[in-house]
């Protein structure tokens, strides 16, 4: 039986770099909110223990794809703890709408959806806490997608506090470039000492993103996208880019600006939601 699972985008409504650990990882404070927009995973259970990705990504070996890695990780851990029914496997395909290197969390969201969906379909019975712990081994952003609620994140992004920011409408624009996260985090001019603040203080301040100055400097397309969008509404970078976004109180206001978007921008309008569309499906 084929099943369909949302794999939503996220926005970093703010992102501040508060330090760098001895292992090279950066500590941060960020606010995650989901979008009612994203990829869709199609999963059909198999009964021969095989994992097949039917929609390979150009330039990425299947076994390196986060979708396959997440499936194999769940299979391994559930098997070792005696919670994997014999023969559990899956055929997985993806309808991809989220750009790679866009700062929307596409790969992390895909991995989280696989963990949540296969845990359900295989009836492994792992808790959300267990799935989030597995997810963290795949990427720092995976746990927030596994938990499925908007959150204030600290540490390297793994310390999550559920929050309920206003659910605005957003115009999200991709300027046609892919930004690998290390390009931003390795830049010597990246701000790395923004003072840590409480969530209550941060929610009262104007939101910004410490990575934005580097992304604008190194990628003229990002600079051009923000320059255009700022003419209409407060706008900023999400994650390490390349996507930028502006917030609006109504869908109609966002769509009016979308109609003005230049042809070189790939833009869409979506609602910010505090409960992930993936978890809404499970209710």
Swiss-Prot record:
It is an enzyme of class 2 (transferase). Its EC number is 2.7.1.148. InterPro entries: GHMP_kinase_C_dom, GHMP_kinase_C_sf, GHMP_kinase_N_dom, IspE, Ribosomal_Su5_D2-typ_SF, Ribsml_uS5_D2-typ_fold_subgr. GO terms for biological process: isopentenyl diphosphate biosynthetic process, methylerythritol 4-phosphate pathway; terpenoid biosynthetic process. Keywords: ATP-binding, Isoprene biosynthesis, Kinase, Nucleotide-binding, Transferase. Gene3D superfamilies: 3.30.230.10, GHMP kinase, C-terminal domain. SUPFAM superfamilies: GHMP Kinase, C-terminal domain, Ribosomal protein S5 domain 2-like. It catalyses: 4-CDP-2-C-methyl-D-erythritol + ATP = 4-CDP-2-C-methyl-D-erythritol 2-phosphate + ADP + H(+). Pfam families: GHMP_kinases_C, GHMP_kinases_N. Pathway: Isoprenoid biosynthesis; isopentenyl diphosphate biosynthesis via DXP pathway; isopentenyl diphosphate from 1-deoxy-D-xylulose 5-phosphate: step 3/6. ATP binds at residues 99-109. GO terms for molecular function: 4-(cytidine 5'-diphospho)-2-C-methyl-D-erythritol kinase activity; ATP binding. The active site is at residues 10, 141. Homodimer. Belongs to the GHMP kinase family. IspE subfamily. NCBIfam families: ispE. Catalyzes the phosphorylation of the position 2 hydroxy group of 4-diphosphocytidyl-2C-methyl-D-erythritol. This is 4-diphosphocytidyl-2-C-methyl-D-erythritol kinase. It comes from Salmonella typhimurium (strain LT2 / SGSC1412 / ATCC 700720).
């Amino acid at each position: 039986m084929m099943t369909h699972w949302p794999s939503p985008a996220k926005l970093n409504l703010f992102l501040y770099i508060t330090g760098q650990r001895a292992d090279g990882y950066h500590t941060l404070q960020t606010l995650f909110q989901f979008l009612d927009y994203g990829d869709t995973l199609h999963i059909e259970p198999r009964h021969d223990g095989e994992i097949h990705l039917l929609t390979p990504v150009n330039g990425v070996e299947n076994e390196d794809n986060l979708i396959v890695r997440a499936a194999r990780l769940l299979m391994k851990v559930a098997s070792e703890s005696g919670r994997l029914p014999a023969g559990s496997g899956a055929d997985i395909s993806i309808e991809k709408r989220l750009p790679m290197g866009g700062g929307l969390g596409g790969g992390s969201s895909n991995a989280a959806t696989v963990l949540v969906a296969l845990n359900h379909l295989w009836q492994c019975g792992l808790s959300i806490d267990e799935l989030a712990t597995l997810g963290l081994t795949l990427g720092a952003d995976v746990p927030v997608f596994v938990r499925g609620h908007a959150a204030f994140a600290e540490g390297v992004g793994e310390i999550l506090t559920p929050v309920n920011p206003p659910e605005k409408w957003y115009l999200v624009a991709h300027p046609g470039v892919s930004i690998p996260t290390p390009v931003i985090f390795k830049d010597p001019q990246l701000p790395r000492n923004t003072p840590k603040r409480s969530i209550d203080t941060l929610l009262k301040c104007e939101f910004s993103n410490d990575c934005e100055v580097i992304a604008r400097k190194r990628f003229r397309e990002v600079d051009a996208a923000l320059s255009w969008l700022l003419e209409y509404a407060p706008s900023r970078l999400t994650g390490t880019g390349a996507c930028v976004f502006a917030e609006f109180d109504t869908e109609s206001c966002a769509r009016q600006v979308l109609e003005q978007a230049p042809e070189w921008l790939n833009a869409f309008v979506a609602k910010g939601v505090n409960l992930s569309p993936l978890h809404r499906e499970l209710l």
